[in-house]
Amino acid sequence: NVVKKMLHNNIKGSIINVSSQMGHVGGPNRTTYCSSKFAIEGFTKSLAIELGPNGIRVNTVCPTFIQTPMTEPFLKDEEFKKTTIGMIPLGRLGEVKDLMGPFVFLASEASSLMTGSSILVDGGWTAR
């Protein structure tokens, strides 16, 4: 509905999808999750091509494990937490505040030439 209204009213702007680092890599026992995130990456790229001529940019923010109520049950498992942090070259889990900069950037005119892109906020996980 938002896109329809933007197109109907000739409103230019920025759509920011949220994916995951797992939309760029695979992982054991995460087939469904990774597949859904790969789908968001493809959706973002397709919409960027489709909506770009109308001045609508579409990008994705792809975080690593962020400490939230959703990830809390996984991170209570000390072995899982240790293994996860071991995959992140910066050596720490993400915090919600780590995502603020990328979202503000993508929503602003500072990213006016970006569309169909992903910003990985993963502490280096996907650099491996």
What are these regions (language model features)?
Residues 57, 92-121, 126:
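C-terminal substrate-recognition "lid" of short-chain dehydrogenase/reductases
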Residues 25-31, 53, 91, 109:
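Active-site loop immediately N-terminal to the catalytic Tyr-X3-Lys motif
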Residues 11, 36, 44:
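Active-site helix of classical SDR
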Residues 4, 49-53, 112:
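Alpha-helical segment proximal to the catalytic Tyr-Lys
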Residues 26-34, 46, 70-71:
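Active-site loop-to-helix junction immediately N-terminal to the catalytic Tyr of the SDR YXXXK motif
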Residues 20:
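Residue(s) in the substrate-gating loop at a strand-loop-helix junction
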Residues 41, 62-73:
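Short, flexible catalytic-loop segment of classical short-chain dehydrogenase/reductase
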Residues 39, 43-47, 51, 61, ...:
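Hydrophobic alpha-helix immediately C-terminal to the catalytic Tyr-X-X-X-Lys motif of short-chain
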